[in-house]
Design a protein with these regions (language model features):
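Primary recognition of N-terminal secretory signal peptides and signal-anchoring hydrophobic helices
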Residues: 1-58, 64
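Short, glycine/acidic-rich beta->alpha junctions
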Residues: 21, 142-149, 158-161
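Solvent-exposed, polar/charged alpha-helical surfaces in well-ordered, non-transmembrane soluble domains
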Residues: 27, 31, 148-152, 165, ...
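Intrinsically disordered, low-complexity repeat and linker tracts
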Residues: 29, 48-81, 226, 286-294
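Peptidoglycan-targeting cell-wall enzymes and recognition modules
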Residues: 62-63, 67-143, 172-238
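Short, functionally critical alpha-helical segments immediately adjacent to catalytic or ligand/cofactor-binding
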Residues: 151-154, 159-175
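Non-catalytic cell-wall polysaccharide-engagement segments
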Residues: 194-294
Length: 294
């Protein structure tokens, strides 16, 4: 369309007497042309799709209880898994590397393209299993049926489905963790995808005991349990932690009620969220909630 695009990696010209041949990094070219790429199966096949999605939306701001400098100190004191310099970057919106997806409101069910979602959902699991040298059948989440169940749980509890998929992948090691794969108690097998109530001194014992108590006897029931846990405990709770950023970096005084201890949690989920955003339907609406420090 005649617009200039800046490449982070320079193109290289090949010597050729007849034609001018330029080598451009594939991912850079797709980005410049606004083309979405999704690989399938064993990575030999893929789908190129002309970008038609506009992720622009309204932006609101949440006022935090502390100044920026004070908040950095308090986060560092609470969890020193990152340096103060790293916290400064993580907490400042200008340091965002997720294209604002860590600030996307996830307290609503956005419409997705089901076929794109099913393909991308399974592809993510396949990639994880291939990297970890295991069969995709080792994942209890794999398959169209489970992808549909995840969408159903997200809709029931009013969660963004793409976010919920990303969160579920992280919590369950893409459906391959011990708690996710389930355990038979009595006559029924139970599943705990998020490791809820799986206390450190004996996570399997307590995790499966809680799953039995809640009746998570199938993957669909375990997904509903996970969605209910996120919805009532965090995203739609009185704490209103309705973005990935606020789940990790609570605006509440005393740093009370943070979902994760990993300082890089919001970036990790946000990065995966950005990657899977191609699953949204063209008419999806977006709302961002950015932090404002005192």
């Amino acid at each position: 369309d005649g617009k200039q695009a800046h490449l982070s990696q320079a193109a290289k010209e090949l010597p050729n007497k007849k034609n001018r041949i330029m080598l451009v990094p594939f991912e850079e070219l797709l980005k410049a042309l606004n083309i979405q790429c999704r690989t399938e199966k064993n990575g030999r096949k893929g789908v190129l799709k002309k970008g038609k999605y506009d992720y622009h939306g309204k932006t609101t701001r949440t006022t935090y209880k502390y100044s920026f400098a004070t908040y950095i100190k308090k986060q560092y004191k609470r969890t020193n898994q990152a340096s103060k310099k790293e916290y400064k970057r993580l907490l400042k919106s200008s340091g965002d590397v997720t294209d604002r997806f860590q600030y996307m409101r996830v307290d609503t069910f956005r419409e997705i393209d089901p076929e794109v979602f099913y393909g991308y959902y399974n592809n993510q699991i396949e990639i994880y299993c291939r990297i970890n040298k295991m069969s995709k059948k080792k994942s209890v989440l794999y398959g169209r049926k489970n992808a549909k169940a995840l969408l159903g749980a997200a809709k029931k509890y009013n969660l963004d489905p793409v976010y919920f998929a990303c969160q579920t992948f992280l919590e369950s090691a893409y459906g391959t963790s011990t708690l996710a794969k389930g355990h038979k108690i009595g006559k029924k097998k139970v599943y705990n995808l998020y490791g809820i109530k799986a206390y450190d001194n004996n996570p399997e014992k307590y995790g499966f005991r809680y799953a039995k108590k809640k009746g998570w006897t199938s993957i669909s029931k375990a997904l509903e349990g996970a969605a209910a846990y996120l919805s009532s405990g965090y995203i739609h709770s009185k704490y209103k932690q309705n973005t990935i950023f606020k789940l990790r970096y609570t605006p509440n005084k005393g740093l009370w009620h943070q979902y994760a201890s990993d300082p890089f949690y919001a970036e990790k989920i946000g990065g995966k969220y950005q990657e899977m955003s191609v699953c949204y339907s063209q008419g999806a609406k977006y709302l961002y909630d950015m932090p404002r420090y005192r």
